[in-house]
Amino acid sequence: MLIGVGTDIVQIPRIEKILHLYPELFAKKILTSKELKQFALLGKINHAAFLAKRFAAKEAVSKAFGVGIGQGINFKDITILNNDLGKPIVEVSSNYTNTLSPFNIHLSLADDYPVCVAFAVIESSYNVILG
């Protein structure tokens, strides 16, 4: 059963400006500890695109849940990792999911400077209704 669909588009130059003003603060605000480890391994030239994709992905996932960031789910509740082939894998904190039935999140990310886009689909094998 389809729970929800969400999408988000982010202008990478917007993230570049934020990084220029707040080089460490912004990453720490939106990334989980697992994501910060990946971020630290990147060269600075890739920081803005990485953060833009994570920002867009988390917004898309929250929209697919039907709530949006800051409306019941936060940036730190969602972790975006990649499998060995580069496919994005979404982990959602038990703080948010403990009342939900099992679900799968499908996420697609793309970037072509100056924009990146994220598209998320959440499905469940159970009949559930979210707020």
Curated annotation (Swiss-Prot):
It is found in: Cytoplasm. It holds the Pfam family ACPS. The keyword Translocase does not apply. GO terms for molecular function: holo-[acyl-carrier-protein] synthase activity; magnesium ion binding. The keyword Metal-binding applies. It catalyses: apo-[ACP] + CoA = holo-[ACP] + adenosine 3',5'-bisphosphate + H(+). Its EC number is 2.7.8.7. Its main location: cytoplasm. GO terms for cellular component: cytoplasm. It is an enzyme of class 2 (transferase). Its cofactor is Mg(2+). Keywords: Cytoplasm, Fatty acid biosynthesis, Fatty acid metabolism, Lipid biosynthesis, Lipid metabolism, Magnesium, Metal-binding, Transferase. InterPro entries: 4-PPantetheinyl_Trfase_dom (IPR008278), 4-PPantetheinyl_Trfase_dom_sf (IPR037143), ACPS (IPR002582), Ppantetheine-prot_Trfase_dom (IPR004568). Belongs to the P-Pant transferase superfamily. AcpS family. NCBIfam families: acpS (TIGR00516), pantethn_trn (TIGR00556). This is Holo-[acyl-carrier-protein] synthase. It comes from Rickettsia conorii (strain ATCC VR-613 / Malish 7). The gene is acpS.
